[in-house]
Amino acid sequence: MSTSQPPRSVKFSDDERGGWSSDRPRRDGAAQRPADVSTRCRTLTPSDRLRYSPGSLLLIASPSAAERDRFAARVLEDRNAYLSLDKVRALLKGRVPDEQVEERALELLGTAVGRRVESGESVVLGLDGLGADERERWVRMAHAVRRPRHIILLEAGRDAADEDARTALDELRRALVAGELGNEGIQTALRLSGGTVAEVKRIVFRPPPRDE
């Protein structure tokens, strides 16, 4: 004749309790989980004038750095808002040893972007790559001080890009079209290709006009 066994108790460690990551206290010395930056991403349509809120971070992603820079120079009302790793590399060339240029350029660009977003200045950043890891650092920097985050995908120069860049471009386009960039903390996304690139005449950072 079998006898019933008492129910077994299961113990959870402090790090396993709670259904949400924010509910789970960290063990002493355990690394904190990155902040959740996810949001709703709205897909914009091309227009001759694009207006973003002052203090925004606008990322420009393109397989061609030259096309990216030409676009920024043509459409930005405030060209001083534009930063890129290429510009910093050029400033450092000949001033620091060649083997230190990349590290110093990343450091200086991070300092410049961080200072501007913290002070509420608008920042337009020409991305050096098309992968999500390239965007994450800057988006988190802006999210930490509650600045709006936007991206423009400029597909000009795709034919001249190498295979890796085209693959990364295809993945970014897919995520944009699917509305998945909100998972990265990006709030609006605009895709420009072919004739739509020329449709954009000006990008400004101004508050919305008051209703009369």
Named regions from a protein language model:
Residues 1-35:
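Charged, amphipathic alpha-helical linker segments immediately N-terminal to NTP-binding catalytic cores
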Residues 5, 58, 158-212:
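Conserved GTP-binding G-domain of TRAFAC-class P-loop NTPases and closely related GTPase folds
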Residues 35-51:
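Pre-Walker A adenine-sensing motif
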Residues 54, 66-121:
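Conserved substrate/cofactor phosphate-moiety recognition/catalytic segment
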Residues 57-61, 124:
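Short hydrophobic/aromatic beta-strand immediately N-terminal to the Walker A/P-loop
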Residues 119-124, 148-150:
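Loop/turn-to-beta-strand initiation segments
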Residues 126-135:
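Acidic, metal-coordinating catalytic cores used for nucleic-acid/nucleotide bond scission
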Residues 145-164:
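Conserved phosphate-donor/acceptor-positioning beta-strand/loop module used by diverse small-molecule
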